[in-house]
Curated annotation (Swiss-Prot):
Coiled coil: none annotated. Residues 45-318 form the Fe/B12 periplasmic-binding domain. PROSITE patterns: FE_B12_PBP. PANTHER family: MOLYBDATE-BINDING PROTEIN MOLA, VITAMIN B12-BINDING PROTEIN. InterPro entries: ABC_Transporter_SBP, ABC_transptr_periplasmic_BD. Pfam families: Peripla_BP_2. This is Uncharacterized protein MJ0642. Gene3D superfamilies: Nitrogenase molybdenum iron protein domain. It comes from Methanocaldococcus jannaschii (strain ATCC 43067 / DSM 2661 / JAL-1 / JCM 10045 / NBRC 100440) (Methanococcus jannaschii).
């Protein structure tokens, strides 16, 4: 079961360098709710709501971790990005245990999981209470609210630790740290006289939303000498914003990046449904981008490459090919 951690342990003999929302102390794992997680190793049956768990399994090539996945929330959407997991899902080897507001409690009992990995969203609070009542072990994850790119990436240590692969995760993570240093060293060796204004945002049901200035993407934008447009928005979470207010500000941004959140966006349809984009400075100057449908998983699988592509987008002139060889973003025009 899960027991509450004492706060002072969070800062004692800390093994985690960048992440703020989990810790590992003397082989003990502390999750996003500051709770010690006790479990039987190795895990053979797990249920996941956090796709970064799956990304970590593939990044570190932990076969036992992949094999242990027996249930996934939003499986129809999440597993399409992963093969052969999606094939296993279609064959009935992996179950869809729930979507927004609809939890398949019976299937959770059938799986009899050794651990459930839940994102620490409010929608999972009723499920958490039910799991406590039924003595089913679970842990809460919060990589999405880390204020630093490397903080989010460091969560690979959290997931890997459940499979005795902490050292493997640490080795991979340390290489990413070195890559980040290389990126910044190269950038800082150039004379950057102007810091472009960047609008990083999303759209859901034709409603724009923006991220707080402490989110890891705005922080990275600042670190690579860009100015985040929505500096007045606090926190790490996203916030819906009135369309007129959004348009009045975003139209003057030098760079626009639309986070598609895994959707396969048709650019012609996007511009047809949002003709105001055509009036944006970023569109007129051919600096309007959208993320690819698989972008989110590549934040983990190809972290350093994704970080560098932000530099290419914000400062294309310092690269020989500019922003013409992007893998994880698509130029709208």
């Amino acid at each position: 079961m899960i027991t509450m951690a004492l706060n002072f342990y969070k800062y004692y003999s800390r093994q985690i360098k960048y992440a703020l929302h989990f810790n590992i102390l003397n082989n003990s794992i502390i999750d996003a709710e500051n709770k010690y997680i006790n479990f039987q190793k190795p895990l053979k049956n797990v249920i996941v709501s956090d796709s970064m768990f799956i990304d970590t399994a593939y990044l570190l090539k932990i076969k036992k971790m992949i094999k242990s996945i027996k249930g996934v929330f939003w499986a129809d959407f999440v597993l399409k990005k992963y093969y052969p997991l999606y094939s296993d899902y279609l064959k009935g080897k992996i179950s869809n245990v729930g979507t927004d507001g609809k939890i398949n409690y019976g299937e959770i009992l059938n799986i009899n999981p050794d651990m459930i990995f839940l994102i620490d969203w409010n929608i999972f609070n009723p499920l958490s209470k039910w799991l406590d009542k039924n003595n089913i072990p679970y842990t809460k994850t919060g990589n999405y609210k880390e204020p630093k790119f490397l903080g989010k990436m460091e969560w690979i240590k959290f997931y890997a630790s459940f499979y005795n692969k902490y050292k493997k995760a640490e080795k991979v993570f340390n290489k990413i740290i070195e890559e980040k240093r290389r990126i910044l060293k190269s950038l800082n060796s150039r004379s950057i006289k102007y810091k472009p204004v960047v609008a990083f945002f999303g759209y859901h049901k034709n409603q724009p939303y923006i991220y707080g200035k402490s989110h890891y993407i705005p922080n990275w934008i600042r670190e690579i000498k860009g100015n985040y447009l929505f500096e007045n928005v606090e926190g790490t979470n996203y916030h819906y914003i009135d369309r007129k207010i959004f348009n009045s500000r975003a139209k003057y941004a030098d760079v626009c990046i639309l986070d598609t959140m895994g959707e396969d966006i048709d650019i012609k349809e996007l511009l047809k449904n949002n003709p105001h984009f055509l009036k944006f400075r970023a569109y007129k100057n051919k600096r309007f981008y959208i993320t690819t449908k698989d972008y989110l998983k590549f934040e983990t699988l190809k972290c350093s490459e994704v970080m560098e592509e932000y530099v290419k987008i914000i400062h294309p002139k310092i690269y020989q090919n500019g922003d013409n060889d992007l893998k994880y973003f698509i130029k709208v025009v």
